[in-house]
């Protein structure tokens, strides 16, 4: 059993990063594509257009709630398993997996039920009432997406657990299979059968079902940490530790939902006061545009989180095995790689915003749509380099078992700064204030993250190699 995971403490760090991070990046990118591909096809369907895009933007935060719960369970279990294997405590690792499966199934069913019961109220909170057409499309899309919530959450929760079992490639393949099927079915349902928002949602749910089915198969054939029957009995200490380790992932996602709710509502309020977007036929444009900008940001963050999350098993094992020098080397290489991703993203948003917009059906829209979209890309994401480094810091601290620091930093970024600036700045700058909330949040968060990065280096230096 030891030989199956000891290479995490001996193999070159750069090679381990390639082995674990690349499949994780692909998995997260593909997972992000579920919603993004829907939005691209919706935007290019002339009978849906910006109304469909706005509806997608309304529903998107609600899928993030499901993702937040799933990654809290999955990432927490992944960190728990990796640390346990580093300490050669395989039975404890197996119990964590069994408990994670049960927690995921129960929470996904409860969440789907709540969504169905309170659908109208939920859509109103996230800005679905901007106009009648947007609300109609939001209702239709949300209903069918909700039916797939249990499949979506199980697939997303199992992904990091599969990586912790030493098989990042299968984790990637299972996600890729579902996403490819979604991409194939989207044009068939939206353009061929003209099912509209229902077609986009059904294609997504079918893809999620395939990913979940593959995850179930792998669960029954795990190499190292396959749970026994008794491991599915919930144990308070293991559930608590798993959820604590995954809390940063949860708060990172759920606080994004809070920020998006604030942003959507500010857009609805201050868009109505704008001379152009206050008109009924243009009211959905700001919400549709900000949704597109967020989708691009999601692609970038999927790469960033993929790099960092892919390193969780490596960090956890080497922390458990008391090899701080390797952890320090990994941290350095990760921060440099994340900053490089941010540089590339910045060049794209500042230099080629019109080309990015074109992917989402700008040819079918008015000049007001295009002009606001260009401005949104250039302002909202102007500090994306700092956003990438901040996100890497959150996840690395989580992987080291520093749940308090990681959780606090994530909460400050998304809730204190993210929601705070989204509510405050529009009072002074109107609709543009919504756009400035993102860079302001990233600048202030980076000041705190920089301190924690330096502190982490000092601690690793003091521990020395055992």
PLM regions: where:
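Transmembrane helical elements of multi-pass membrane transporters/channels
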Residues: 19-38, 144, 178, 207-211, ...
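Residue-level hotspots within pore-lining transmembrane alpha-helices
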Residues: 26, 30, 34-37, 66-70, ...
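Short runs within selected transmembrane alpha-helices of multi-pass transporters and secretion channels
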Residues: 27, 144-163, 171-179, 200-213, ...
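Helix-terminus/linker motif at the lipid-water interface of multi-pass membrane proteins
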Residues: 29, 33-54, 123-132, 188-194, ...
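Small-residue-rich hydrophobic transmembrane alpha-helices
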Residues: 53-113, 152-171, 287-347, 351-353, ...
């Amino acid at each position: 059993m030891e030989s199956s995971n000891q290479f995490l403490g001996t193999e070159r760090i750069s090679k381990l990063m390639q082995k674990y991070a690349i499949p994780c990046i692909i998995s997260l990118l593909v997972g992000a594509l579920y919603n993004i591909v829907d939005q691209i096809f919706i935007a290019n369907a002339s009978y849906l257009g910006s109304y469909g895009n706005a509806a997608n933007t309304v529903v998107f935060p609600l899928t993030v709630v499901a993702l937040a719960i799933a990654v809290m369970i999955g990432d927490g279990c992944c960190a728990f398993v990796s640390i346990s294997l580093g300490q050669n405590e395989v039975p404890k690792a197996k119990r964590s997996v069994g408990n994670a499966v049960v927690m995921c199934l129960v929470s996904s069913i409860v969440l789907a039920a709540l969504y169905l019961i309170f659908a109208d109220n939920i859509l109103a909170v996230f800005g679905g009432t901007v106009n009648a057409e947007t609300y109609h499309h939001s209702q239709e899309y949300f209903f069918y997406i909700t039916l797939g919530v249990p499949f979506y959450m199980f697939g997303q929760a199992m992904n990091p657990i599969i990586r912790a079992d030493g098989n990042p490639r299968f984790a990637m393949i299972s996600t890729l299979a579902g996403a490819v099927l979604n991409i194939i079915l989207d044009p068939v349902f939206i353009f061929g059968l003209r099912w509209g928002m229902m077609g986009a949602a059904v294609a997504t749910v079918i893809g999620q079902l395939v990913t979940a089915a593959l995850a179930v198969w792998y669960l029954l054939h795990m190499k190292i940490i396959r749970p026994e029957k008794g491991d599915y009995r919930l144990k308070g200490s293991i559930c608590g530790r798993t959820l604590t380790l995954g809390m940063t992932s949860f708060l990172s996602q759920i606080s994004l939902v809070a920020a998006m709710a604030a942003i959507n509502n500010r857009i609805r309020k201050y868009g109505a006061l704008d001379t152009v977007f206050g008109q009924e036929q243009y009211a959905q444009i700001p919400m549709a545009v900000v949704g597109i900008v967020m989708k691009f940001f999601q692609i970038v963050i999927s790469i960033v989180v993929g790099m960092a999350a892919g390193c969780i098993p490596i960090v956890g094992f080497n922390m458990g095995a008391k090899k701080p020098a390797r952890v320090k080397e990994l941290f350095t290489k990760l921060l440099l790689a994340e900053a490089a991703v941010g540089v590339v993203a910045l060049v794209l948003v500042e230099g080629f915003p019109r080309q990015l917009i074109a992917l989402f059906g700008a040819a079918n829209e008015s000049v007001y749509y295009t002009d606001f979209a260009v401005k949104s890309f250039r302002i909202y994401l102007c500090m994306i380099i700092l956003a990438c480094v901040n996100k890497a810091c959150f996840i690395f601290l989580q992987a080291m078992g520093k749940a308090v620091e990681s959780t606090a930093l994530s909460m400050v970024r998304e809730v204190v700064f993210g929601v705070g600036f989204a509510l405050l700045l529009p009072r002074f700058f109107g609709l543009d204030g919504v756009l400035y909330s993102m860079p302001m949040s990233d600048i202030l968060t980076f000041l705190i993250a920089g301190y924690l990065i330096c502190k982490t280096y000092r601690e690793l230096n003091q521990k020395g190699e055992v």
